[in-house]
Amino acid sequence: VKPAPFDYVRPTDLAGAVAALAAPDSKVLAGGQSLVPLLSMRLAAPSLVVDINGVPGLDTITEVGGGVRVGALARHTAVLESPLLARVQPLVPAALAHVAHPTIRNRGTTVGSLVHADAAAEMPVVLRLLEGSLDVEGPAGRRTIGARELFVGPLESAVGPDEIAVSAFFPALPAGAGVAFDEVARRHGDYALVGAGAVVDGDRIRVGYLSVSDVPVVVDLTGVAPADRADAALEHLDAATDIHSTAAYRRQLVRVLTDRVVAVATRNATAQGGGR
């Protein structure tokens, strides 16, 4: 299938990109790994595509106060292989290792995945679990959207139609804390049937889940007995039956993955001096 006709512009600065995006029915193109398939299937039919790949300075990965800021054009591969993120917030590369395949990671962007807001994708639940944020630029200037407010529905984010996401902020892992991420998919690189990430910080235990709700879900399991954690999590999840899996199998995967990621995150915390 071929895309419906559209106009194309490639601005050379952020102000020009924001101005171009003011046109009706316009869409931003960064890595294109979500938008281009939607165009090809005519599930998206913008009148104008604004390609931001000509805007300098959006591909950086930098340490800032309390964490790491990832630019809108930083490719998944660069984020996955970043020594800075491996040191400051290892949950990000741990999850990115499960994202698609190398050819897609070489082009796709981490920030683009956040804006796409697919609840079956890894990056939205990671940002939500880490309580990170997204910076966006629009006609009214720049604003920050917290992860709790960012994901508002299936494939729907709080980024306005006239705004461009410029960077994501991933908070640093607290000293002595541990993280883990795992998922189950029919084939490596496919969308997960269920995925889970955990952050264990002292006595605090939080687990985030993908593919079991319309939006990324984070459950605080602090103080919950190990045998009861999965049941406590399932109260907040919506494991549905579809062509990929039954609801019963997804619930079983929640049980397995909850125990697994909490155990691994606890071991990682102990290894970093955060013994419990």
Q: Which residues are covered by each model-predicted region?
A:
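C-terminal structural segment of proteins
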Residues: V1-R276
